[in-house]
Amino acid sequence: MKILFVSSEVFPLMKTGGLADVSGSLPAALSALGHDVRILMPAYPEAISAAETPNALSLRQAGSQLTLLSTRLPGTTVPLWLLDAPASFGRFGNPYLAPNGAPWPDNAERFALLARVAVDLTQDRLGLGWKPDVVHCNDWQTGLIPPLLSDEPNRPAVVFTVHNLAYQGLFPYETFQRLALPPRLWKMEALEFYGQLSFIKGGLVFADRINTVSPSYAEEIQTPEFGCGLDGLLRSRKSCLSGILNGIDDVAWNPATDPYLPAPYGPDTLERKKVNRTVLRQRYGLPDDPEVAVLGMVGRMVEQKGVDLLIDILDDLLQLPVQLVVLGSGDKEFERCFERAAAARPERIAVTIGYDEPLAHLIEAGADIFLMPSRFEPCGLNQLYSQRYGTVPIVRKVGGLADTVEDATPERLAAGQASGIVFEPAKPAFLLEAVYRALALYREPEVWRAVCKCGMAKDFSWRKSASRYVGLYREALAGMNAGCSIADPRCAA
């Protein structure tokens, strides 16, 4: 099968979140299954620097001269095309946000360009001599590809993956006009969303198959609580909507071979995990007390991640035998709260604002407990890393967290099936109670070791998930023009 994978970020070329991890791992896993997968992404300066000596191919699109840089995804044999349009993508830093933290004012134009080039690529109008059977689109940045493809008589099948429904690519009507999109697309059944242009609706309406990155999230987004105003549309496409759990890069995230760890370890050498805890503590000047558990947290400091719940219980945590290590960035007020707490109690709380890949690995290995109290979580990766590293996650029962962590109930503990602590209401008191539960288990070394080993035994590799995506692609191919789309893709203006 020939698959074009389109994403606005791909690890290790550009990363702001889990989308990049998926885009850097899934194509390689599909290739390993024997499929011809090729990636298209913007040529950000960082991506060009990280790419392996790309070849430049000149092309024209809508009267503009553009360049397609042809290379390979680093560390793989997967072909990678970088869309080199300096006026749109030649900016260092966050690919979506300007230095002042506001979205780039031309984001609609930038990602409409990516969509148009993707469509031309699928129709072999760029002279590459290759046409995909399936186009796999990811999040709002690729949302215009499905509706633009609907005008093509020999289009490929389209799969649209929702990594986070909260980010929708909303722009005023004037942007719709400026992009010169077909007038027929300006209606409620297409791209119009309460008077605005919605990129994500393009994927949700026109794709042959839609999926989210966990089964629970696929169910949740059909409800008003999690549907972000699109739950009615998603319910109407329920027969074409499914959830496939993300995998993880089990080579990069392997405690037995992790180059970032001072003491690699496995299920049979779990005691070496304590060496990593000691090194983590030394990095921050935290006392090395075996009776004190280290709580770790890595991620964006935003309300979605439940960071405010943790901030609300900081005073209570300080009454417990724990230390807290936090790595992340986001909401400036949340950042300041953690910085103030660390300054006031440096022997108990350590914070690094920003992102540091080696440190993220060390926290996963050195922490005893990992905190992930998300308000919503399409899939989540850190709870998967934590279990692989024998670090017990505390998670909220939502989205991919609910699908991947087995709560340490008495029944599951007795059956050897418990891998973490799960709580439900998004309230500080319930997070604190979950910490109490974790510490009670921590005080029973044999029980604790069993929970750690249960998580380490799970298979979260991309091999399993990639096979499910192949099945989804086949469904999309079979379902083309079979009445699955709620909008007739060839309706008149």
Curated annotation (Swiss-Prot):
Disulfide bonds: none annotated. GO terms for biological process: glycogen biosynthetic process. InterPro entries: Glyco_trans_1, GS/SS, Starch_synth_cat_dom. It catalyses: [(1->4)-alpha-D-glucosyl](n) + ADP-alpha-D-glucose = [(1->4)-alpha-D-glucosyl](n+1) + ADP + H(+). ADP-alpha-D-glucose binds at K15. GO terms for cellular component: cytosol. It is an enzyme of class 2 (transferase). Its EC number is 2.4.1.21. Pfam families: Glyco_transf_5, Glycos_transf_1. It comes from the Bacteria. One of its GO terms (molecular function) is alpha-1,4-glucan glucosyltransferase (ADP-glucose donor) activity. Belongs to the glycosyltransferase 1 family. Bacterial/plant glycogen synthase subfamily. Synthesizes alpha-1,4-glucan chains using ADP-glucose. This is Glycogen synthase 1. The lineage of its organism: Bacteria, Pseudomonadati, Pseudomonadota, Gammaproteobacteria, Methylococcales.
